[in-house]
């Protein structure tokens, strides 16, 4: 049975003092024992969060890492080896904001996935369609292409040590949420694509839903058979709301 995972993506939010307050709130949460929980703060707060959450059952990850695994001459980037060194356990790759705003291609995303995994980090591969792509009936085609790029480059076995997050771009930061049925359709297609290559890998990989996840909608989403938790954006900046989402995953 797949163990649920709820990961909070703080995006480009926080100051030293506000992060300290959020850490305090997270430490006070009573988290369900059967759920893995992680937060992904901005890079410059990672060490603060790791130290602040020491002893609490919350993993810390990063929102991005470089295409090269080891440190070197790549100004402004952070090597996955450096993230592993400070105590990160996972990293987002291919988030839609980086694909759309910063122009990261499927090829770049695949390279980041490989680099992160080579350093012992768990890549959380983000896939999803824009509103225009959904309205054109291309949702499953787009997601299959994004997932297939990594499979073609690294083989399906790489997903035995990875997580996939489906995040419909039209639902991110908009307040809109895919219905449980819409989300399940895509999650089932992702698992089927993996199963076509390796049934055991497909059975074990955790698939998260991301896209304006709130406590009020979480339980119904997480009740779908192929949804194994959530990649939570804005709601993860509120400790109580985030805790409620984690409890929904445990129910």
From Swiss-Prot:
E.C. designation(s): 5.3.1.1
GO cellular component: cytosol
Name of the protein described by the UniProt record: Triosephosphate isomerase
Keywords (A to Z) from UniProt: Cytoplasm, Gluconeogenesis, Glycolysis, Isomerase
Pfam families cross-referenced by the UniProt entry: TIM
Gene Ontology BP, a term: glyceraldehyde-3-phosphate biosynthetic process
UniProt subcellular location: Cytoplasm
Described purpose of this protein according to its UniProt entry: Involved in the gluconeogenesis. Catalyzes stereospecifically the conversion of dihydroxyacetone phosphate (DHAP) to D-glyceraldehyde-3-phosphate (G3P).
PANTHER family for the chain: TRIOSEPHOSPHATE ISOMERASE
Sample GO molecular function, one term: triose-phosphate isomerase activity
Gene encoding the protein: tpiA
The protein's assembly and partners: Homodimer.
Family: Belongs to the triosephosphate isomerase family.
Pathway: Carbohydrate biosynthesis; gluconeogenesis; Carbohydrate degradation; glycolysis; D-glyceraldehyde 3-phosphate from glycerone phosphate: step 1/1
Top-level taxonomic group: Bacteria
Ligand binding (substrate): 9-11, 173, 212, 233-234
Protein species of origin: Pseudomonas aeruginosa (strain ATCC 15692 / DSM 22644 / CIP 104116 / JCM 14847 / LMG 12228 / 1C / PRS 101 / PAO1)
HAMAP family from the UniProt entry: TIM_B (MF_00147_B)
Active site: 95, 167
Reactions the enzyme catalyzes: D-glyceraldehyde 3-phosphate = dihydroxyacetone phosphate
InterPro entries xref list: Aldolase_TIM (IPR013785), TIM_sf (IPR035990), TrioseP_Isoase_bac/euk (IPR022896), Triosephosphate_isomerase (IPR000652), Triosephosphate_isomerase_AS (IPR020861)
